[in-house]
Amino acid sequence: MTDKKTLFIDGKEVEFTDEPNLLEVIRKAGMNVPTFCYRPDLTSFGACRMCVVEVEGRGIQSSCTMPPEAGLKIHLNTERTRRIRKTVLELLLANHDKSCLTCEKSGNCELQQYAEEYGIRKIRYPDKELDEYLPVDDSSPSIVRDPNKCILCGACVRACTVSYTHLRAHET
């Protein structure tokens, strides 16, 4: 049996045992922090920076890569963390399909949902190079990759590495 330890999230005392990172502790406590790149079954990557939290005495940390420690005092939605997340979203949208905010998926897209939640109505940093779309890569029988919609979270690369679908046959 693993000993229970305690930390504090927004002033609430939260017990944890063997969770690998702060994000898992936060989720098990029934709280939410946005994230794009985190997948519980893959190695933590910390690429998207949406899961930032403020840790007293340590500043801003990505909750998916920081291990929990007894006594930590964590703040989820401070003005600073919300501002950082909004900037991350604005930068992701700058390199994203220009029709994202009016996309047909309307509501079924995490990027669109977070843009709405953080009050992003227009693309603040338009990328002039994205006037022409990159071709869709449908060469794989398993994955169709549209680079115009990719947010560089790394989840597909890590999933393929773990599942060994990145290995090639003798003919390729």
Predicted regions and their residues:
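Internal active-site segments that recognize and position negatively charged phosphoryl groups
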Residues: 143, 147-159
